[in-house]
């Protein structure tokens, strides 16, 4: 089965990084799902997060399920967490929360693992990237479960400007001048008088830029500076959002990958992965 079969595309995710999950075993996915279901329904005590959250109390949890996929020659192993639930205010509508856990897209050396004091053998698993799409209150509870059950740290995956540029290179090689939608780029400044700058480039103009075999971004920066005297390469400006016909990525870790990008999704997710194992 492909990611498309799991409704992966055309929805917005928030990206996270996880430290190794200790005591996690693929052979125990059914039991882990049952534990999470019980945790979401009843919590661990009667005075904790669950009874204090009115928003979470509105959720009626049906079931949490972990499923293993991937591990092929073209795609690494990944897990999918599905949580089905209703809300007390609307019992007629079935809702679902999703989380994808991806193992490393690149092979780390044993030296790197030793240096970062991470043992990837035995009953610990390292997921380099997790993509979450679920109600905020539900996610807080799932995060708490993973931290308590597997002694893992979960951190927001902020997307640096360099990674956004890497995605633009991947996108340029993929579209081959065939895009029918404009490209939209946004830079933030941190200056209250000019908080952000957004530029939209029409498809016909993109085709002209793409005639060159080189990366279009430096050419675009020169053109903008020449026409507007605005130097977007200045350190004051930080690329914060890339909106293409294949995917939307933001520096805050939000991303939406469209079904058109199926043949580059591996490269896009690889670009989000850290170049070396992080230290926790």
UniProtKB/Swiss-Prot annotation:
BP GO terms, sorted: attachment of mitotic spindle microtubules to kinetochore; cell division; spindle attachment to meiosis I kinetochore
Xref: Pfam families: CENP-L
Keyword annotations: Cell cycle, Cell division, Centromere, Chromosome, Chromosome partition, Kinetochore, Microtubule, Mitosis, Nucleus
Cross-referenced InterPro entries: CENP-L (IPR025204)
Compartments it resides in: Nucleus; Chromosome, Centromere, Kinetochore
Highest rank taxon of the organism: Eukaryota
A GO term from the CC aspect: microtubule
Keyword Cell cycle in record: yes
Function: Component of the kinetochore, a multiprotein complex that assembles on centromeric DNA and attaches chromosomes to spindle microtubules, mediating chromosome segregation and sister chromatid segregation during meiosis and mitosis. Component of the inner kinetochore constitutive centromere-associated network (CCAN), which serves as a structural platform for outer kinetochore assembly.
Annotated family: Belongs to the CENP-L/IML3 family.
Subunit field text: Component of the inner kinetochore constitutive centromere-associated network (CCAN) (also known as central kinetochore Sim4 complex in fission yeast), which is composed of at least cnl2, cnp3, cnp20, fta1, fta2, fta3, fta4, fta6, fta7, mal2, mhf1, mhf2, mis6, mis15, mis17, sim4 and wip1.
The name this protein goes by in its record: Inner kinetochore subunit fta1
Originating organism: Schizosaccharomyces pombe (strain 972 / ATCC 24843) (Fission yeast)
């Amino acid at each position: 089965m492909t990611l498309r079969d799991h409704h992966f595309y055309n929805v917005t995710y928030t990206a996270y990084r996880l430290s190794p999950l200790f005591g996690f075993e693929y052979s125990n996915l059914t039991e882990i799902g049952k534990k999470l279901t019980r945790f979401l329904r009843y919590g661990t005590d009667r005075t904790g997060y669950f009874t204090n959250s009115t928003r979470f109390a509105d959720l009626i949890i049906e079931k949490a399920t972990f499923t293993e996929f991937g591990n092929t020659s073209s795609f690494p192993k990944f897990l999918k967490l599905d949580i089905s639930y209703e809300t007390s205010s609307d019992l007629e509508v079935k809702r679902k929360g999703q989380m994808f856990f991806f193992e490393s897209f690149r092979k780390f050396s044993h030296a790197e693992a030793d240096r970062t004091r991470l043992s990837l053998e035995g009953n610990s698993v390292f997921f380099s990237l997790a993509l979450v799409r679920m109600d905020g209150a539900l996610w807080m509870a799932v995060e708490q479960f993973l931290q308590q059950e597997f002694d893992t740290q979960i951190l927001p995956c902020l997307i640096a400007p360099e990674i956004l540029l890497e995605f633009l290179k991947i996108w340029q090689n993929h579209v081959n001048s065939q895009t029918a939608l404009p490209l939209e780029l946004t830079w933030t400044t941190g200056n209250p008088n000019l908080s952000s700058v957004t530029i939209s480039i029409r498809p016909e103009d993109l085709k002209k830029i793409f005639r060159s075999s080189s990366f279009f971004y430096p050419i675009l920066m020169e053109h903008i500076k020449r026409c507007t005297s605005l130097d977007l390469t200045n350190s004051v400006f930080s690329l914060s959002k890339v909106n293409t016909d294949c995917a939307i990525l933001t520096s805050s870790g939000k991303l939406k990958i469209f079904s058109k990008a199926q043949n580059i999704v591996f490269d896009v997710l690889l670009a989000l992965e850290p170049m070396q194992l992080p230290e926790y």
